[in-house]
């Protein structure tokens, strides 16, 4: 038995989960928020308890030190060296990394180089890796990439219709994201359906504040909605998803909001999507409450959101030539029952239908009617478990 920790480092946060492996038992989990800001918050959950402290945490190294000391303080571990492996979520692996990789040689430098593809994520992911390397230099460190699952896409799916030189020289292509989640729920769907994954055609919908949809055939990603960066694809909480590229030069010419690349990135990544259209919130719970109150902008934002998801599901039904199941996961996908109903009701012609008695808040499993040809599943994602499994597989 060994103890492995899965890490998801953000720019000002550190989410973690400690496992006993290979039993896959969660010993503790937690979240450190507001790193680099005053009154940082560290929360540790274990044995049915939740302990929280407020203190100033200047950087990720200090955050990791507090995390490790908390594990000792609460008698979850006796010493640092009880942890024998750490796995880090990294958003962009580019064409360098087709699978999870042990951190050695120039791996970390390449992760930082790939910040060009995920400027909001990779720098923070790399900071988490460096922090653990500084405090636990001798344990196995593994980087697990959101993009790895999508490296099975055929070239016709990942190439853009741009001059070839932009692919060969600049590596402009579709990379996708949320691959760890799509991979996990596809495997769980096969178990739920009682069929080999290799025999299934699935459409997995990871719908949270960010969102992506993937066509999965025989356990492999064959297409996915996110593109060169996590900005592409469906409409999201604060991101546009797909828009006509000509909008950008137009707004650069005729408004004062698009003067620099940073301006463009800010508007498209942080000020658009549900938030931009509703002028209210990026949170589906707030949107649904505003819709119930008759707010027109919130209603429009919700309708646009559902519409774009339906279109991608329809597109992937064509790519796969049908599907055995549509899977919903992540914050919105797992918890917003009205959203699931509305998405599926608009594509029922394909043979999918939701049973209203099964489609309730907190439900997991098959929510389809008995007669549905395409099953509709709700499966909680567990990216941390996939990370822990990969660490165990790659340990020295």
Curated annotation (Swiss-Prot):
<keyword id="KW-0547">Nucleotide-binding</keyword>
<feature type="site" description="Transition state stabilizer">
    <location>
        <position position="178"/>
    </location>
</feature>
<keyword id="KW-0479">Metal-binding</keyword>
<feature type="binding site">
    <location>
        <begin position="206"/>
        <end position="210"/>
    </location>
    <ligand>
        <name>ATP</name>
    </ligand>
</feature>
<feature type="binding site">
    <location>
        <begin position="331"/>
        <end position="335"/>
    </location>
    <ligand>
        <name>ATP</name>
    </ligand>
</feature>
<dbReference type="GO" id="GO:0006083">
    <property type="term" value="P:acetate metabolic process"/>
</dbReference>
<dbReference type="GO" id="GO:0006085">
    <property type="term" value="P:acetyl-CoA biosynthetic process"/>
</dbReference>
<protein>
    <recommendedName>
        <fullName>Acetate kinase</fullName>
        <ecNumber>2.7.2.1</ecNumber>
    </recommendedName>
</protein>
<comment type="similarity">
    <text>Belongs to the acetokinase family.</text>
</comment>
<feature type="binding site">
    <location>
        <position position="15"/>
    </location>
    <ligand>
        <name>ATP</name>
    </ligand>
</feature>
<dbReference type="GO" id="GO:0000287">
    <property type="term" value="F:magnesium ion binding"/>
</dbReference>
<feature type="binding site">
    <location>
        <position position="383"/>
    </location>
    <ligand>
        <name>Mg(2+)</name>
    </ligand>
</feature>
<dbReference type="InterPro" id="IPR043129">
    <property type="entry name" value="ATPase_NBD"/>
</dbReference>
<keyword id="KW-0808">Transferase</keyword>
<dbReference type="InterPro" id="IPR004372">
    <property type="entry name" value="Ac/propionate_kinase"/>
</dbReference>
<dbReference type="GO" id="GO:0005737">
    <property type="term" value="C:cytoplasm"/>
</dbReference>
<comment type="subunit">
    <text>Homodimer.</text>
</comment>
<feature type="binding site">
    <location>
        <position position="89"/>
    </location>
    <ligand>
        <name>substrate</name>
    </ligand>
</feature>
<feature type="active site" description="Proton donor/acceptor">
    <location>
        <position position="146"/>
    </location>
</feature>
<comment type="pathway">
    <text>Metabolic intermediate biosynthesis; acetyl-CoA biosynthesis; acetyl-CoA from acetate: step 1/2.</text>
</comment>
<dbReference type="InterPro" id="IPR000890">
    <property type="entry name" value="Aliphatic_acid_kin_short-chain"/>
</dbReference>
<dbReference type="Pfam" id="PF00871">
    <property type="entry name" value="Acetate_kinase"/>
</dbReference>
<feature type="binding site">
    <location>
        <position position="8"/>
    </location>
    <ligand>
        <name>Mg(2+)</name>
    </ligand>
</feature>
<keyword id="KW-0067">ATP-binding</keyword>
<keyword id="KW-0460">Magnesium</keyword>
<keyword id="KW-0418">Kinase</keyword>
<comment type="function">
    <text>Catalyzes the formation of acetyl phosphate from acetate and ATP. Can also catalyze the reverse reaction.</text>
</comment>
<feature type="site" description="Transition state stabilizer">
    <location>
        <position position="239"/>
    </location>
</feature>
<dbReference type="GO" id="GO:0005524">
    <property type="term" value="F:ATP binding"/>
</dbReference>
<feature type="binding site">
    <location>
        <begin position="283"/>
        <end position="285"/>
    </location>
    <ligand>
        <name>ATP</name>
    </ligand>
</feature>
<keyword id="KW-0963">Cytoplasm</keyword>
<dbReference type="GO" id="GO:0008776">
    <property type="term" value="F:acetate kinase activity"/>
</dbReference>
<dbReference type="InterPro" id="IPR023865">
    <property type="entry name" value="Aliphatic_acid_kinase_CS"/>
</dbReference>
């Amino acid at each position: 038995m060994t103890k492995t920790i899965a890490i998801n480092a953000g720019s000002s946060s550190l989410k973690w989960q400690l496992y006993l492996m290979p039993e896959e038992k969660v010993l503790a989990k937690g979240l450190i928020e507001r790193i680099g800001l005053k009154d940082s918050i560290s929360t540790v959950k274990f044995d049915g308890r939740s302990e929280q402290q407020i203190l100033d945490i200047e950087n990720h190294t200090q955050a990791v030190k507090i995390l490790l000391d908390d594990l000792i303080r609460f008698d979850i571990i006796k010493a640092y060296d009880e942890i024998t492996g750490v796995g880090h979520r990294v958003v962009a692996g580019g064409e360098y990394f087709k699978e999870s990789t042990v951190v050695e040689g120039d791996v970390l430098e390449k992760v930082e180089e790939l910040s060009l593809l995920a400027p909001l994520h990779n720098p923070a992911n790399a900071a988490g890796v460096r922090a653990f390397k500084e405090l636990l230099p001798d344990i196995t460190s593994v980087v697990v990439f959101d993009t790895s699952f999508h490296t099975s896409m055929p070239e016709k799916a990942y190439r853009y219709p741009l001059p070839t030189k932009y692919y060969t020289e600049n590596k402009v292509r579709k990379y996708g994201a949320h691959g760890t989640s799509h991979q996990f729920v596809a495997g769980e769907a096969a178990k739920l359906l009682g069929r080999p994954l290799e025999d299934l055609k699935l459409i997995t919908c990871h719908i949270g504040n960010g969102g992506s949809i993937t066509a999965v055939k025989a356990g492999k990603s064959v297409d996915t909605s996110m593109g060169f960066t996590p900005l592409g694809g469906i409409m999201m909480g604060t991101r546009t998803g797909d828009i006509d590229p000509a909008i950008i030069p137009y707004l650069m010419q005729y408004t004062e909001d698009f003067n620099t690349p940073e301006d463009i990135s800010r508007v498209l990544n942080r000020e658009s999507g549900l938030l931009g259209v509703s002028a209210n919130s990026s949170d589906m719970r707030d949107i649904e409450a505003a819709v119930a109150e008759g707010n027109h902008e919130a209603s429009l934002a919700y309708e646009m959101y559902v519409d774009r998801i339906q279109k991608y599901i329809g597109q992937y039904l064509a790519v796969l030539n049908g599907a055995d199941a549509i899977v919903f996961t992540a914050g919105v996908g797992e918890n917003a029952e009205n959203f699931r109903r509305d998405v599926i009701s608009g594509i029922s012609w394909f043979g999918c239908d939701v049973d209203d008695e099964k489609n309730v808040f907190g439900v997991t499993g098959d929510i389809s009617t008995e007669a549905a040809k395409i099953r509709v599943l709700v499966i909680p994602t567990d990216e941390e478990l996939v990370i822990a499994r990969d660490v165990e597989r790659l340990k020295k």
